Amino acid sequence: GDPGDPGDPGDPGDPGGSDGPVRIMPLGDSITGSPGCWRAMLWRDLTDAGYTDIDFVGSRAGDGCGFPYDHENEGHGGMLVTNLAASGQLSTWLSATEPDIVLMHFGTNDVWSSRPTQTILDAYSTLVAQMRAHNPSMTVLVAQIIPMDSARSCATCAQGVRDLNAAIPGWAASESTAQSPVVVVDQWTGFDTGSDTYDGVHPNASGDAKIAQNWMAALTPLLD
């Protein structure tokens, strides 16, 4: 809808309609969910910039991040994207929340568990298919995930992230359609595990700010 036209509330019976708020699902693991304060920063940045007709959705309530924000999300600590794809659980969450846009930063635990890159990409494809089954016009923003410090995670983790991220653009191009775009969001470049994480894996405030900025740059053209 047009945020400048308060006289048109839209059809309340059509949550996915063009006049209702844009429903955005943050999807992933603990980097997204616990505490995942990049979501709070992103919400604040979007609303400060005038994008107020938005609704973050998910089955999880978020943690406190120091200021009010729309905290609902699907960031599940410890989750492997390969396990979620196999379980079919995403379909239940989609039915309950009806997102228009998904922000997916997913695969860190898979890399740590030595899942091959192609296996992770196949899981991404399964999730995208489930998303489209619920909303044929779903927009999927897929992160090239933040780096991991092998000294503080697993010996193969740093290279595993590089391998996954190198493969994501080609995968996204093969999955994307005009009706349901799959957009790559680079969360890796410029992210430093030394200064932007507290443990070599999870973002600190500096890392959260970078993640929020990258999502913001990808989201605003979709919301204009």
Q: Model features per residue range: what roles?
A:
Residues 24-25, 31-123, 157, 162, ...:
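Conserved SGNH/GDSL esterase-like catalytic core that processes O-acyl groups on lipids
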Residues 147-186, 205-209:
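Substrate-gating cap/lid alpha-helix
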Residues 30, 34, 44-49, 93-96, ...:
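Structured segments of extracytoplasmic/periplasmic soluble domains
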Residues 20-24, 49-55, 97-103, 134-141, ...:
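Loop/turn elements at helix/coil->beta-strand transitions in domains of secreted/extracellular proteins
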Residues 105-109, 129-163, 188:
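Active-site segments of SGNH/GDSL-like serine hydrolases
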